[in-house]
Amino acid sequence: MMRFLISFLPFFFLVVVLQEATCFNQHKELSHNIRNKLKGRLAISLSHSPSQTAKGGSRVVYPAEYGADTSGARDSSDAIIKALEDAFSLESEAELLPGVKDLGGVLVDLQGGNYTISKPIKFPSSAAGNLVVQGGTLRASDAFPTDRHLVELWASSSQKLSKTASFDDLYNRKLQQPKGIYYEDITFRDILFDSGYHGGGIFVVDSARIRINNCFFLHFTTEGILVQGGHETYISSCFLGQHSTVGGDSGERQFSGTAIELASNDNAITDIAIFSSAVGIVLRGQANIVTGVHCYNKATGFGGIGILVMLAGNSQTRIDNCYMDYTAIVMEDPVQVHVTNGFFLGDANIVLKSIKGQISGLKIVNNMFTGNPNAKVPIVALDGVFGNVDQVVIDLNSVDGMGLRSTVGKQSVAGNGTKWVADFSGVLVFPNRINHIQYSFYSQGGPNNNNNNKFVPHAVTNVTNNVVVVESDKPVNGVVSFLVEQ
C-alpha cells in the first residue's frame, strides 16, 4: 500500500501543475481580452465630442472636456456655458412642474477645478430641473461686470425686481406672472464663488426648490446670494464674506455689500456664517425662516446690520437660534415675526423701525443679551413712533450689561402713607402704553402698625407715561406689588 502511494504522488503533482498552468494561461488570455475591450471603449468615448456624449445620454457633464481650464490660467466662461447648454439639451419626456423638463439628475462636475470667469454663467432659458452642479471654484476676472453675478438662474422672460420692491409689488407681480417657475430642483454644492470685488455670487429668479449647500462666497460687492420671486430656496452650511477675516478686521468700517438677500417667499437659511459685509441678511419676502446663523459682519456701531427684516406690515418671519455678534437685527413694521433662543453679543440688539407705525404679532422671547455695562444699550430699541401695537410679547430674556426692555413689568413698592408709585418707563418698550394692570395691596397696619387700619380702601388713581399710582384713603404701612402689560 505504501509503495502505491509513493508511486501515485508524482502523477498527482503532475496533474495539479498541468491544471494550474492551464488556469494561468486562461486567466492571462482573459485579462488580455478585457484590456483590449476597455481600450476600445475608451477610444470610442474619446472620439466623441463632449456635446455628442451629453446628448447621447451621459449623466455626467465635465466642463473641462469643453475646453474649460481647471488651472484658471485661461477664461472658462464659454466652455462652462456650453456644458450647461448640453446638459439642458438632454432628451427627457418627464416633467417636474408643468413645463419644467426633468433632466433626470444630470451632474455638472467641476472636478475640483479653479475656473476664471469673465462673464456670468447664465443658465439656459428653457425651463428645466433635477440637475446638480458641484465641486470646484469660480473666480471672477478683472473683466467681470460689477453689476452681475457669477452664476445666474433667470430666464429671458423673467422680470427682475427693483431694490425697493414692497409687498404690494411682489403680490402684483405674482398675479401678473402667468409663466411661473422656470427652474426647479437645481443643486449647487461644494463650490467656492469668488467674485473678485466684481459683482455678486449667485442670482436666482422665478425658481422653486433650489439648494445651495456647503458653498463659500467671497469678495462680493453686491450680494453673495440674491433670490427674487419663486419660493423654497434652501441655503445651508455656507460661509459668506466680502473679505476673508475671522473678526476684528482693521477695515471693518469699509465693509459693503449684502451676504444674502431674499425677495422671495418660503425660503430657509440654515447653519450659515457671515463674516464680513455691510448687511448680513435682507428679507423682503414672507414666510422665511432663519436658523443657526452666526452674523459677525460689520458691527452695528460702524453702521452695519446683521439681519434686516423688510416687507413692512407683512413680514411673517421666524428667526431662531441665531448668534448676533456685535451686529443688530432691524425690523420694519414687523407683523407676525418671532425672534427666539438667540445670543446677542457686544451690545447687539433688536431695533424696531417705524414705516407706517404698525406692529402686530411680534414675539421676542428666550434670548440672551450681553454688552458693555457702562453703555447700557437697550436690548430692544424703537426707531420712530408706533401708533398701532397689538399682540406684542417681549419677555423672558436674560440680560447682562445691557438695558432690559420688556412688554411686561413687575415691581413691588413699600411705603408708609397714602400713595405708592411704580415707574416702568425704564423697562417697558413702548412709551406711555399700559394696556393691563394687576396689583396686590399688602397692609401691615397704620403708621404705627395699628391693626385698625389694615383694611383700607385703595385704588389705581393714575396711569401716565408708564407710571402707575395706587392710593389709599387712609395712611397705612403697606406693600403694593404691580404687574403691567403692554
Language-model-detected regions and their locations in the chain:
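Right-handed parallel beta-helix
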Residues: 130-139, 182-195, 208-219, 231-249, ...
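Short, conserved, surface-exposed binding loops centered on an aromatic residue
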Residues: 282, 310, 330, 413-414
